[in-house]
Amino acid sequence: MNRILYVVAICLMVTQYAQAQDSTVNSNTNFFNTNIDYAVQAQFSIGGSSPLGMPREIRKIESFNPGFSFGLEANATKWIHENGKWGVRLGLRFEEKGMKTNARVKNYLTEVVKDNSKVRGYYTGKVQTNVSNTYFTIPVLAVYKLSDKWNLYGGLYFSRLIDNTFDGYVSDGYLRQNTPTGTKISFEDGSQAAYDFSDNVRKFQWGTQLGAEWKMNKHFKLLTDLTYGFNNILEKDFNSIDFSMHNIYLNVGFGYSF
């Protein structure tokens, strides 16, 4: 008799456990299928790595080319408010950020390579800079449904560098070695000296993202947003450029909602 009661008790426990598991699975299934939108999107970016304001060392920007920067993203938006007005969006984005600039500078702190040796000092003349960095980015955004057609969104993004270029050259000028009154090294008659700070690009970036999207129909949408990097794109202890540079980009794209 005791054995029968024991078996019945075990059966009841197993049944209750199975029901609890089914409830958990159903709950998880409902979470990922109810009040949630999945989307993929592509974007084109215009901008660059820029200081905040014009440093006194940069006297003139002679040319600026943002190049062709492209991004792809997959994201999910979970609508959490009872009337579906507010949501939280989490995504994964592959994106490029780059630019080319030509500037005329004065007493611009830099480090160049001359005769296979690094020379640090204050440069006056022309500087060309090439930046091309690739990131994996995770945006974490709040979304507000303004109407059936319009959504507004904003929040933070966190980026991990996966490929990096930050280089260029100086020409048509001179460099004062170590100090603004140090030994003069001239670069004239087409003479150039290269620099390469690619290894000094910061591996982690974070910033803010603000934008809007317009639904063309049930599946397709157009979007635009602005991203601003809070931290310098170069490492904290890097001192061959004496001002901070931030990623500032305007992004325009389109998306498909499933």
Sequence positions of predicted segments:
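Cleavable N-terminal export/targeting peptides
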Residues: M1-N35
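Transmembrane beta-strand segments of Gram-negative outer membrane beta-barrel proteins
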Residues: N30-I46
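Residues on the lipid-exposed face of transmembrane beta-strands in outer-membrane beta-barrel proteins
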Residues: A42-F44, F70-K78, L92-F94, I138-Y144, ...
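Extracellular/periplasm-exposed beta-strand and loop segments of Gram-negative cell-envelope proteins
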Residues: G48-G67, K97-T134, L161-K203, N231-Y249
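Short connector loops at helix/strand junctions that flank enzyme active sites
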Residues: G67-G71, K85-G87, N133-T137, S147
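Repeated loop/turn-to-beta-strand initiation elements of outer-membrane beta-barrel proteins
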Residues: G84-V88, K149-L152, K218-T224
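Early exported N-terminus immediately downstream of N-terminal targeting peptides
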Residues: G87-G98
